[in-house]
C-alpha cells in the first residue's frame, strides 16, 4: 500500500530514479494506493539529460508493491520493491522502456502500452 510521502523506485527510462507521493488520485480522502492506481508525485532523484527533472510534479501508475495485491482466485502477488511508471494524461508512459516485471492487474486498468513494453508480466 502506497500513501502520502511514500518513496517509490521509477521503473522506466524517463530520467527519474525516485519519486515521492504527493496524492493518491481517485476519490476524496483516499489514503492508500495499490497496483494499477494513479498517484501524483514529485521527482526526488533524476539522471542528467532525462525527460523529467528533479522537482517536477508528475503522474505515475504503480506497477509493483511490497504489500502485493489479492487476485480473484485467492492468490497474492508480492514484489521486492515499490515501483511506479511515469505516465502522461492519456495513460501512455513518458519513457520508452520498462524495467523489471509488472503485475497483470495493469491490463485491466487500460495500461496496455506499459504491459507490452514490460519484459515480464506476472
Curated annotation (Swiss-Prot):
Record-linked CDD domains: Ribosomal_uL14
One GO biological process term is: translation
Q: Which domain of life is it from?
A: Bacteria
Q: Which keywords belong to this entry?
A: Ribonucleoprotein, Ribosomal protein, RNA-binding, rRNA-binding
Gene Ontology cellular component annotations, sorted alphabetically: cytosolic large ribosomal subunit
- Output the SMART domains linked to this UniProt entry: Ribosomal_L14
Which Pfam family, just one, is annotated for this protein? Ribosomal_L14
Renumbered to this chain, the signal peptide range is none
Among SUPFAM superfamilies, the record links this protein to: Ribosomal protein L14
Q: What is the role of the protein in this entry?
A: Binds to 23S rRNA. Forms part of two intersubunit bridges in the 70S ribosome.
Please report which protein family the annotation says this sequence is part of.
Belongs to the universal ribosomal protein uL14 family.
| Description of how the protein assembles with itself and partners | Part of the 50S ribosomal subunit. Forms a cluster with proteins L3 and L19. In the 70S ribosome, L14 and L19 interact and together make contacts with the 16S rRNA in bridges B5 and B8.
Q: What is this protein called?
A: Large ribosomal subunit protein uL14
The organism is Streptococcus thermophilus (strain ATCC BAA-250 / LMG 18311)
The gene behind this protein is rplN
Amino acid at each position: 500500500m502506497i500513501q502520502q510521502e511514500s518513496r517509490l523506485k521509477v521503473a522506466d527510462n524517463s530520467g527519474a530514479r525516485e519519486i515521492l507521493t504527493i496524492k493518491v488520485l481517485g476519490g476524496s480522502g483516499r489514503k492508500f494506493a495499490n497496483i494499477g492506481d494513479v498517484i501524483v508525485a514529485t521527482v526526488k532523484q533524476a539522471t542528467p539529460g532525462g525527460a523529467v527533472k528533479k522537482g517536477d510534479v508528475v503522474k505515475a501508475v504503480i506497477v509493483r508493491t511490497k504489500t502485493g495485491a489479492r487476485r480473484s482466485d485467492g492468490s497474492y502477488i508480492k514484489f521486492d520493491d515499490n515501483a511506479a511508471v511515469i505516465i502522461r494524461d492519456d495513460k501512455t508512459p513518458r519513457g520508452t522502456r520498462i524495467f523489471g516485471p509488472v503485475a497483470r492487474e495493469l491490463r485491466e486498468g487500460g495500461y496496455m502500452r506499459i504491459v507490452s513494453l514490460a519484459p515480464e508480466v506476472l
